[in-house]
Amino acid sequence: MAVKRICIFPCGGMKKVESTVARIASYIVNEDLLPGKTMLMCVPAFLRGVEEDILMVENNPTVVIDCHEESCGSGLMALIGIPPAARIYIPDVVSQTGLIPGRNRQVLDLVGERLAQEVARCVAKAAQWMLEDQYYSFEKRKVKAFNQNLCEFSDEAIDLLDYVQVEPAIYRPKSMPPLWD
């Protein structure tokens, strides 16, 4: 099925500047780089079962932005049984570029903004590929039933995604269609 829109799921990490970087990067993609072609996942609405948010993830490829080794975004996707189409891993962006997240969580400082721009570039690259490549094929999937332990995931859940590195900081689960790899 041809891809018309991409869902972006930024990490919502508590007390981590990188989570602010992830959220700002997702807004940069949504508003500036690919306006009208992306949607932002709202985790609280998703967890409450808001139909619009559930359908967004089921009917569109999702790019997860994980901001730290806990990989909360990937973990949630693994638990609901829908692998993300792509994953951007902020620690890899940091090590690749030398950019740092900065210190301010509420409003990013200049160095944090630069990192957010670079993360947004990675997200947009993956999203643009899925939107434009005529051979990229996305199959709709159904969310597994929610349970009380939804947020109690382990590394095993993330390991099940079996990520393949496409290029520095950009990954996809082995089970998902190739990007440009």
Label the predicted regions.
Residues 43-49:
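Short acidic loop-to-helix transition motifs that present clustered carboxylates
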